[in-house]
Amino acid sequence: MRTTVRICGEENDMKLLEMNHVRKEFDTLKVLKDISLSVEEGEVVSIIGPSGSGKSTLLRCATMLETMDGGELLYIGEKAAWEVNGQTVYAPKAEKKRLASCFGLVFQNFNLFPHYTVMKNITEALIVVDKVPKKEACERAEKLLEQLGLADKKDAYPCQLSGGQQQRVSIARALARQPKILFFDEPTSALDPELTVEVLKVIKELARQHMTMIIVTHEMQFAKEVSDRIIFMEEGIIKEQGTPEELFGTDNERVREFIGHLSGYKAEEN
């Protein structure tokens, strides 16, 4: 478990994200069953569990890419979605857009525009959506590329980059909008082991800087080292959660079995 200056439960803790009694169905399949969770400012939460447990759907509901079928979603105490007479109601478009600026999302398959350079991939949303002046947008992008070891790639196209470099560009793009919370949906699942280490080092550094993050991952050792809290999901519910020490030392036979089956990434000691 990482060292953190934040202690959950203190009066000045800020809940950046709250999800209360969230439900989601696809046809007759209940994917999320009454899920409730909250994330404090500066907290790193990893979500683990078998495929089909609802982890990615939970992230997509949290980021409003999927419409919830029930429950409540709040960012910094402000409602983005709530339930009225059994139906989910979302905030008006302008309010929803403002609340969406609170978070950034890094996908497992990079989702870069292939016909844009690295620089344009990072700055396009800043300029077009956020109305940031082009000069400021470029300055933000250049600073992030420098921090992520990609300063010499700003004029390159995605096809000219390795998978690890593409994912670092995706992280830079998310960070450029200065979100309060970052979501990662299995950020290394499309990478080979060497490139996986490259990307996980970047996320570990963000954790050291107290960036609030929710990370869906199968990298057990990484989750143990980087997280304040680990959530185990299965069959659309949160079956167990706690500190890394609590999860990795649990008496819950199913959780022990799952963790034991995934040796995953062995984090480098720094």
Task: Identify the role of each PLM range.
Residues 182-185:
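Catalytic Walker B motif of ABC-type/P-loop ATPase nucleotide-binding domains
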Residues 176-180:
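A short, proline-enriched helix->beta-strand linker immediately N-terminal to the Walker B motif
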Residues 48-50:
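The feature captures the beta-strand-to-loop junction immediately N-terminal to the Walker
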Residues 235-236:
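Conserved ABC ATPase "signature" C-loop
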Residues 116-124:
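Short coil-to-helix segment of the ABC ATPase nucleotide-binding domain corresponding to the Q-loop/switch region
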Residues 157-161, 165:
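Conserved ABC ATPase signature
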Residues 241-242:
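ABC ATPase "signature
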